[in-house]
Amino acid sequence: MASSSGIGVMFRREQAPQQLPDYARRVEAAGFDELWVVEDCFYTGGIAQAATALAATQRVTVGLGIAPAVARNAAFLAMELATLARMHPGRVHGGIGHGVAEWMDQIGARPESWLGALEETTTAVRRLLRGERLTV
């Protein structure tokens, strides 16, 4: 995963995904260091957007803000982030959050503890990205 302290911009969730490649190229040409894509339920997928932005650019770091911990399987999330990081070394920021409670309710993903679910998923993803094996 990337490490950056630069200035970034966000691709708003309301924007049509077809606009992302051109937007990403313009962000990079303008000298920004980071482009953040949003994963919100019922809009567009964050992994697909991150892959699109990375493929359309050469230098800019792309951040995923955020993959909801209770809606994403940790093994699959780690696999997707690892694939992006291998294809675009040093240019990927993976973001994991608890998600919007109302939206998580709508998809039947309400945990007993929001922070507990976030910690469990984040820990599992980190360990998997380090190459560790996990038992569930």
Regions found by a protein language model. Name each.
Residues 32, 70-73, 103-105, 114:
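Conserved N-terminal glycine/acidic-rich loop preference
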Residues 13-15, 41, 68-70, 98-100, ...:
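Active-site-proximal loop/turn and secondary-structure-junction residues that shape catalytic pockets
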Residues 3-5, 78-136:
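Internal, glycine-rich beta/alpha segment that forms the wall or movable "lid"
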Residues 17, 67, 108-111:
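Active-site oxyanion-binding pockets that recognize sulfate/phosphate
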Residues 22-24, 49-52, 76-79, 107-111:
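Short, glycine/charged-enriched secondary-structure capping and boundary segments
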Residues 1-65:
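N-terminal beta1-alpha1-beta2 module of alpha/beta enzyme domains
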Residues 64-76:
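Structural motif corresponding to the early beta-alpha repeats
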